């Protein structure tokens, strides 16, 4: 299905929903926080089930949702694009916050089940990329990411990139910007590592960051190595790249990179790195609930090759504490992370 066909389908679905919502005075939409509403397909990631549990929009919230659908309809008709921030400025009288707009846009994507860019809505990209990568952006400018000091901003519309070139051997995804910048300062590109592309989503990755990682991995068959903190939320970020996210499973857009591996910081290596309990924070109640919930996910239960991940999650539980990559940096202020830890792990394929 090409782009124009998707736009036409989106228009038809918007018109149908607008009529139904105005007639019924309410709208049922999939509950995007319920893991029972998605199923795991190996090689693709998360997909919605046929009969999901639903929530309801009515009253003022429904009115705001209809406004957003009308904005999307106009964007498709005029073949224009806007950001969620711009939508908030258009609706600031009726919407109390950016978060409310973001939620209603997510509801629209879930109900329509089409990629957000088809609807003409982009999010401001926060991710960075640096390394062996060149491309031409939507304005015809050639961007050489090897020249970026501190990293180039990932474009909002990754689908518009052309003439993409790289001779990298792999993609290194770093959870936090502080670690990303420290690796640059410590000469990760001047050491003994093979040619690479380094990406950070600055925490939870946005859509553009995930699109870029998926695009580069699929187009150039590049392995994706992911470096996160050793805590439940670092592991969640790894799962997001590898299997997809709960919220975006409704968008009919492949974003998961099933070949991704967890490079570190692994629970099983904390003792080897001599990170003592006194320097690690204990798990919070929220951390504990997160680990319990993750352990029940379908992709951890179904995939035989996930024995290693299940074991690491058990070790994380047993340790009862969490460690940040920044602690390694502070313990060894001699470029250890860039010049020793990463080269050693990558050369020995020491990942999960």
Positions of the model-derived regions?
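Nucleic-acid enzyme cleavage-core boundary/entry regions
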Residues: 1-225, 232-352
């Amino acid at each position: 299905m090409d782009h124009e066909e998707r736009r036409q389908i989106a228009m038809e679905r918007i018109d149908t929903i607008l009529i139904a919502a105005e007639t019924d005075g309410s709208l049922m939409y999939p509950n995007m926080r319920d893991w029972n509403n998605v199923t795991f397909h190996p090689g693709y990631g998360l997909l919605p089930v046929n009969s999901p549990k639903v929530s309801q929009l009515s009253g003022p919230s429904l009115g705001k949702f209809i406004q957003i659908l009308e904005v999307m309809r106009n964007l498709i008709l005029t073949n224009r694009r806007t950001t969620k921030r711009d939508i908030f400025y258009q609706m600031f009288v009726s919407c109390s916050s950016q978060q409310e707009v973001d939620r209603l846009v997510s509801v629209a994507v879930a109900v329509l089940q089409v990629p957000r860019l088809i609807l003409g809505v982009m999010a401001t990209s926060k991710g960075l990329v640096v390394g062996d990568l060149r491309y031409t952006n939507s304005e015809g400018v050639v961007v050489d990411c090897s020249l970026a000091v501190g990293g180039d901003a990932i474009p909002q519309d990754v689908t518009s990139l052309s003439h993409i070139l790289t001779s990298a051997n792999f993609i290194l995804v770093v959870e936090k910007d502080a670690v990303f910048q420290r690796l640059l300062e410590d000469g990760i590109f001047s050491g003994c590592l093979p040619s690479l592309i380094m990406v950070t989503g600055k925490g939870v990755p946005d859509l553009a960051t995930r699109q870029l990682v998926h695009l580069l991995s699929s187009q150039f068959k590049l392995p994706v190595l992911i470096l996160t903190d050793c805590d439940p939320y670092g592991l969640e970020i790894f799962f997001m790249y590898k299997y997809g996210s709960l919220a975006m499973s409704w968008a009919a857009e492949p974003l998961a990179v099933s070949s991704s591996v967890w490079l570190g910081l692994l629970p099983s290596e904390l003792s080897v790195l001599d990170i003592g309990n006194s320097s690690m924070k204990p798990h919070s109640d929220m951390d504990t609930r997160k680990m319990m919930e993750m352990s029940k996910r379908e992709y951890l239960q179904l995939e035989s090759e996930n024995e290693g991940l299940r074991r690491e999650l058990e070790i994380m539980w047993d340790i009862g504490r969490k460690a940040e990559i920044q602690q390694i940096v502070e313990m060894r202020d001699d470029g250890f992370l860039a010049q020793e830890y990463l080269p050693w792990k990558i050369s020995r394929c020491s990942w999960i």
